[in-house]
């Protein structure tokens, strides 16, 4: 829980050097001074603590005992993936609880400021909502596809839990045999959630921005007389070329890290399929479960080198190597 809070604080401190467009979804200030940083950090602390308390209360209302509710509240808000028991089915007993848990998982999928912006709607322009609006559409589309095409042999509530858990990079799920959907859930893990959330992943808005920029570049060559704006729906913010480069480098760093870690795991004797899955979950800080076909994977059998490699790449996946490079460029390579 503290790690998730610290991660959100770090976004505030790094936003000035990392992403100009995302800063506009947080504040109207052109640059963060110390008072603005403290203001946003205090707001994060209140929201983070308040949402945790609300999750705890809701879980209690739906007959989940207090100790389990507290553990789940800490895990859900921080995308931690920790359980007080070995099997989630020992806590979640019926379909109603499964659906409620699936919805509560979205607290770490959407921006931590989403609820705050809704409450104080009158003081906000569309820029404060555009990422979450995209995420709402993305979530509805994915859930609809699963409901129509992947819910014949499995209960939809179990699929909904796996979807929310994967999108939020939490990872745990009910024990189900869905080997045909393992890759789909892994893709959802890679995409991730909001920039201002405790979820990991490459972030949906970055992938969508790269996709739109690529399409515009292709169209600009086929229709040179037309002007194509790098602007997403629900916003007036334009993505400049420098930000697109940062998004591309983020994807490049992930691919490079994924290739190195998969190679290390394969060399250590783990079969390629498990190495592939474990590398994605490690870089995206997502716990292994039956949704990804790794519920029975035994980490005790790994040697020390592989264990430390997993720890190292968890850190790389969380803070992003690109962030470190940007800090070096900002403070050490000013000239």
What is the role of each PLM region?
Residues 1-335:
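Membrane-proximal intracellular helices of multi-pass ion channels
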